[in-house]
Amino acid sequence: MTVILATIKWIAVVLGAMIALFILGLVLVPPLTRSFTDSWGATEQETATTFPGDDIIPAPRENSTKAITIDAPPQIVYALIQQMGQHRAGWYGWDWFYNATGSSDFVDGHYSTRIVPELQAVKVGDRININDAVAYTVIEANTDQALVMLAGSLTAQQIGEPSQPETWSANTMAWILRPTSAGGTRLILRMRADGTETGFARWMWNGPFNFGGALFSRKTMDGIKRTAEALAQ
């Protein structure tokens, strides 16, 4: 009996320590890494540049710029980006997470390592699902150059207008493609957000959710790079 109680106590201590470390991580890691994750891979010039979609949320509470160089032409990279989404070609990241959270049902059963012909005609007004409850609306689709999407409780026309409700949220995801001199692509992801969240909700969005989103965004960019470069061979 003493051995059993000692074992239970040991398990409780270990679990308590793990929970404490997790909470400590939620509090400390996001602010300590924010300056890095908000500009992951981007140059100072890229972070300071105005890109398509910036005018939708002109004075954002959240603003980040991530970038990666891909040894594949913009045509291939854009094709992969415009086919992303739930019930589409996936997110080029951790499929197990999207399966677990109901954000998958991808056309190939996992993120597609091919260009899917039937998903190559994205246009303004199209909705790209994150999951069954949340979707982005395409605001700008400039083939091989930029794909800008908006999510939240507002339309692009409502932001800053008298019709804007008292409680709202909005965030943009802009994929910017720039050809490189070597025939590749400089892929830039500009994300901006604003809203009326306060207190704990704002802390969660500014801290843990922002940090987690940075990790998933980078994983997606790495997946796009890997897939595009394989297709370019």
Name these PLM-found stretches.
Residues 38-40, 80, 173-175:
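Tryptophan-centered motif/residue detector
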Residues 1-6, 198, 202, 206:
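Juxtamembrane/transmembrane-helix boundary motifs in multi-pass membrane proteins
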Residues 24-63:
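Short acidic N-proximal helix/loop "leader" segments that mark the beginning
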Residues 2-37:
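N-terminal type II signal-anchor transmembrane helix
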Residues 201, 205-221:
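Short, charged, low-complexity patches
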Residues 8, 49-52, 57-61, 69-71, ...:
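Glycine-rich portal/gate segments that line the openings of hydrophobic small-molecule binding cavities
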